[in-house]
Amino acid sequence: MSSCGVLVVAGTHGNEVNAPWLLQQWQANPDLIDAAGLAVQKVIGNPEALRRRCRYVDRDLNRCFLPEQLEQGASGLEFQRAGELLRLHGPSGEQPCAVAIDLHSTTAAMGNSLVVYGRRPADLALAALVQGALGLPIYLHEADAQQTGFLVESWPCGLVIEVGPVPQGLLNAGVVEQTRLGLESCLRALYQVRQELARLPDALVVHRHLGSRDLPKAENGEPQALVHPELQGRDWQNIASTQAMFRAADGTDRCEAWVGGEIPVFVNEAAYAEKSIAFSLTRREVWPVEPNWLLALKQLLAAA
């Protein structure tokens, strides 16, 4: 690796328009976001999907970073774009980056939040620094064989900033502002690590992925009930064991069992209907921060 640059990606999904608009404004006004002296590469993840205002053209780009398929030359616009991003800005690319920050929005009531994939020490260090600065909740997504190939996993360190709720395709000033705050906090944290100024909090609070639930469906795949109105909008919240998950058109509740301590996230996210996900379930955990997390991030940024 010849650079510790930072890759900032917006528009990984073409109908998530707020982060691309923010990057366009940043390009026009470099003082809009403090890059903290870092070498930042600003990229639209899926330009064609953004032009069409659709999530993707052939396949979800954020599931295309699969080494085996990329090595075999998998076809389709998004696989080609994934390979191009790695050739340009991957750890050994033409303009190599060590860190990737992927900017997303959601129709779910996730607020301003972070998504971390797995338990790489450098990722956890960056997430802990941002959580310590802004108090953002963290969704730790791991051990889900049905959901793989995420963009940030192809860089040595990476986080997703996820902001919502906002309808697909709608520009919203509040969402843009929250995205900017999250991005600036990430860049500031990386600067502090490089300058030996970073101080990790004592603990990291994560919501660890347990699995996902789909809507009840008939044999033909049509939903028989929808997310319960009292569950809608309750991302990150403790749910009573008696709370119904779903409600049918006639008002009948579907009371499937909750396991104690389960907390929903991405409740009724519009884009996940095609993935047969009505919401995901997590468990809130408090982890002691380990010294090797910050060391891993320091070593990564010092490798330039």
Swiss-Prot record:
The answer to whether the entry has keyword Amino-acid biosynthesis is: no
Entry binding sites for substrate: 55, 62-63, 162, 272
What does the record give as EC number?
Answer: 3.5.1.15
Q: How is the cofactor bound?
A: Binds 1 zinc ion per subunit.
Q: Which domain of life is it from?
A: Bacteria
Q: Name one GO molecular function term.
A: aspartoacylase activity
Alphabetized, the UniProt keywords read: Hydrolase, Metal-binding, Zinc
**GO CC terms, sorted:** cytosol
Q: What class of enzyme is it?
A: hydrolase
Q: Which residues bind Zn(2+)?
A: 13, 16, 104
Record InterPro entries: AspA/AstE_fam, Aspartoacylase, AstE_AspA_cat, Aste_AspA_hybrid_dom
Q: Does the keyword Hydrolase apply?
A: yes
Query: What reaction is this protein's catalytic activity?
Result: an N-acyl-L-aspartate + H2O = a carboxylate + L-aspartate
According to the record, the signal peptide region is none
Q: Which Gene3D superfamilies match?
A: 2.20.25.160, Zn peptidases (3.40.630.10)
Q: What is this protein called?
A: Probable aspartoacylase
